[in-house]
Amino acid sequence: VTLDLQCGSALESITAAAAKIESGLADLVIAGGFESSSTQPVRMWNSNHPDYQEGKSYTVAKFIPDIQGEQVMLEGAEKTALTENVTKADMDPWVLLSHKRAAQAAKEGILSDIQFSIADSKKDEGIRPSMSQRLLDRLPCLLPGGSIITAANACLMHDGAAFVVLCSEAYRKKHGLTPQAAFRFGTAIGSDPFLS
């Protein structure tokens, strides 16, 4: 089954899997999600559609009103930072600390037992061990007229996937499995993307 709840798709698939197990319709379900920015389709409206413009394409699926453009997540991040009085200077130390911790975790192989390689690579290309304040100071803001969101403190465009195996207590006992976690409750709540 494929669920599309945009950013919440993986959580929703796990919640649906748990509900299926709880209802007795399944004993074991693999659930999760993936995103592949490198294979993201480029779309165009058909020439008979009112939104058609010669040579204009879009990549963000039109699940959202037209007032929200291709950069709605960046715009939302910028607006939220401004609303909450968070400056780029406030964010920079967290950016540096995050990359430092991620690089250390990668070096120590903390996640190596739950990562697998694709094309002989396990490297997380989002980690920048050489990130410095000097580099952060040089990065331009991503939005015209923006003052906060840069390539260093924004979400990455990436390819990635994560899945979990959920099972009933009866299945777990029958097969002698040791759980790593227990699912208690899940919910999805939508909000204004401009306040991401």
Give residue spans per PLM region:
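Flexible glycine-/small-residue-enriched beta->alpha junction loops
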Residues: 28-79
